[in-house]
């Protein structure tokens, strides 16, 4: 087979796999992933990648719905089943499927697990590479409404756990915004 995919108990080709519209990864980027290359149908550093995957999930309160050894066996099996000996193996866990809402309680309670393997090759080690440099501003773009809202999900959950409605975010002494609301400050109030 050319490629193979798994999503919450269903196995098919990547092209035939369907994901629900209310999967939290599409709303919020609410999940973690790891990826590894395979050479001769063997994933490189599989255990290291899977340990990091489980550790990442734990840090954002996602319980991966498959034990480590079972997931390891699935990845190995998928790598053997595809035609190409050189491939990319990918694993992803999300908070699951549920109606859109920042707090975890909207997630429906069951995390989702994705696995896929498709043909890919490592770039030759002796190849020349070109690069540019840019300042790392990945987390300074709260003015851009992307769907990568994992920090907002975490902040909203922490507010709920504290019995609060919202988390006000700041950089030093400057308020930037809230986890899922705008921040407005009235500094000069007058009674007329």
What are the roles of these predicted feature ranges?
Residues 1-167, 171-174:
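Conserved alpha/beta cores of soluble small-molecule-handling proteins
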Residues 167-168, 182-185:
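Short beta-strand scaffold segments in enzyme catalytic cores
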Residues 187-192:
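Conserved small/polar residues in nucleotide/adenosyl-binding loops
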